[in-house]
Regions:
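Membrane-water interface at loop-to-transmembrane-helix junctions
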Residues: 211-223, 277-295
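Alpha-helical transmembrane segments and their helix-entry boundary regions
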Residues: 15, 42, 84, 88, ...
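Helix-loop interface residues and adjacent transmembrane-helix termini in multi-pass membrane transporters
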Residues: 36-39, 113, 140-141, 168-169, ...
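Hydrophobic transmembrane helix module of multi-pass membrane transport proteins
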Residues: 91-221
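Helix-loop junctions and terminal segments of transmembrane helices
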Residues: 60-76, 256-279
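Short, Lys/Arg-rich, polar N-terminal cytosolic tail immediately upstream
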Residues: 1-8
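Transmembrane helical elements of multi-pass membrane transporters/channels
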Residues: 11-26, 147, 153-158, 175-194, ...
Length: 297
């Protein structure tokens, strides 16, 4: 039991490090970007990122949980794991086509996106590259250190380059380009780790891909209800109000999201162990251990 708690606690701690970094890194660049860009341009960045929350939700489609579950249930069978990753990758590629079509319609109909169409499409490329990061795989095999280090290194480089490259209001287009660069670094990092673990991706039949989408749909609905609310507010604000108004709204929502993010690492960290052991006692002990941290947050 002690070993199980230690493993789950380690997973949670690593995910907390990543969650804290997800909050801190944008705040590190916030004063600089607010000084470099006009309020309207900062509003454009915030608005497009809110739209990308939905694009990401569509392409993830709950696979962070359903994929993690399948990887855990594969019980270390490398061949089976490779097939699961291939099947989910196919599903996400199919979903990316749907997400891109929806995005093109939004660009056509929403003025703030239409005016910054190239910026929006480049930002979508960064979300698209997440398909090849396979976070559910490393959560399933409980290699949370890979997930966390991948994020810290790729985003850390992007933040450093932000200070080095972004110099004036005309550099707006460089923001998504730096995000794409960070994602490419993450993709190369992850594929190196997969080779080291001897995991080879093999693709599955179309019927099995559709079946995977069907099984993951319940997780997708859960993610939509839990994640999309804040982004929906910002999207609606951008439809009816100016980019300047979006900037002030997004800043408020960013701090709210920072507090809410403290809860996610607990459920994500114990999920692989719960799937493997189905141990409710472990769940209760972990919750009791980390509750003071969450309450203080």
């Amino acid at each position: 039991m002690k070993l199980k708690i230690s493993k789950s606690a380690s997973n949670i701690a690593l995910l907390y490090i990543m969650s804290i970094a997800q909050v801190i890194l944008p705040l590190v660049t916030l004063p600089y970007l607010a000084r470099i860009f006009t309020v309207s341009n900062y509003g454009v960045i915030s608005y497009v990122k809110s739209v990308m929350v939905y694009a990401n939700l569509i392409m993830q489609f709950g696979f962070l949980l359903s994929g993690t579950r399948e990887i855990v249930e594969a019980k270390g069978n490398i061949e089976k794991i490779g097939k699961i990753v291939g099947k989910i990758t196919q599903a996400k590629l199919l979903l990316s086509v749907i997400a891109f079509i929806v995005l093109l319609i939004m660009i056509k109909t929403i003025p703030i996106l239409n005016k910054h169409a190239i910026f929006t499409i480049i930002m979508f490329c960064q979300v698209f590259l997440d398909i090849f990061i396979y976070e559910y795989l490393f959560r399933g095999i409980e290699k949370m250190n890979i997930v966390t280090m991948r994020y810290l290194i790729s985003k850390g480089i992007a933040v450093a380059l932000t200070f080095a490259i972004i110099r004036n209001n005309g550099d707006l287009i460089k923001i998504p380009l730096l995000d794409v660069l960070g994602s490419l670094i993450a993709v190369f990092w992850v594929n190196f780790e997969m080779k080291r673990l001897k995991i080879k991706i093999t693709f599955d039949s179309f019927n099995n891909v559709i079946s995977a989408l069907r099984e993951s749909s319940i997780y997708f609905i859960s993610d939509m209800s839990g994640t999309a609310f804040n982004a929906l507010n910002t999207v609606c604000v951008g439809i009816f109000l100016s980019a300047r108004d979006v900037a002030f709204w997004a800043l408020t929502m960013q701090f709210i999201a920072a507090v809410q993010s403290l809860y996610n690492p607990i459920q994500d960290g114990i999920y692989p162990e719960m799937v493997k052991k189905r141990d409710l006692k472990l769940f209760r002990k972990i919750i009791l251990f980390f509750s003071p941290l969450v309450l203080l947050g």
